[in-house]
Amino acid sequence: MRFFERFKTTKLKLEAELIEREIHRSKRFGYTFSLLVLEVTNSIPRGLSKLLPGRTLSFHTLQKNLRPYDKIVNSLVRRYYIILPQTNKIASDKIKHRIYEMAEYYKWGDINIGIATYLDDGNDAKSLIKAATELLEDYSYRDFNDETTIQLARV
């Protein structure tokens, strides 16, 4: 158990460091960025996979549908952070819905996504991670398959 706690702490430090780099860049150039926390449920066998697409959530499919400069950070076994530079709350919400559409199309199963935006939800890495984690939304197909769903434009 002690090993897992140390591993978890080390991983969170690495993620916080990447988020802090993006915060410094945002301060320097005067723009915001968003942090998406993507959590996959137990219905996906091994989470996000670079090697085993198909039964798992494919890293390449997710990366292909994001912008080239968006960063996907592998956190723990079933949680991933997506850093979206130069993205405000509205654009990150559209990206979240695009990920939900991909989950439905590729039959990934249920996923949860939380969003935090720099300056709106926090000024440092810890507060952004905490805000996004608290806002994890449960996703199920019946909630998303509604005629009033927003038409998603590529951001």
Model region roles, listed by residue range:
Residues 18-49:
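Active-site-proximal structural segments of metal-dependent nucleotidyl cyclase/transferase enzymes
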Residues 34, 74-85, 107-135, 146-151:
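A short glycine-enriched loop-to-beta-strand structural element that forms part of the catalytic core
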Residues 24-28, 57-89, 101, 105-108:
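Conserved helix-loop-beta segment at the catalytic/binding core of cyclic-nucleotide signaling proteins
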Residues 2-23:
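Short coupling/linker segments associated with nucleotidyl cyclase/phosphodiesterase signaling modules
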Residues 15-19, 52-62, 96, 129:
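Heptad-repeat coiled-coil signal-transmission/dimerization helices
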Residues 45-54, 82-98:
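Short helix/loop segment flanking the catalytic signature motif in cyclic-nucleotide metabolism enzymes
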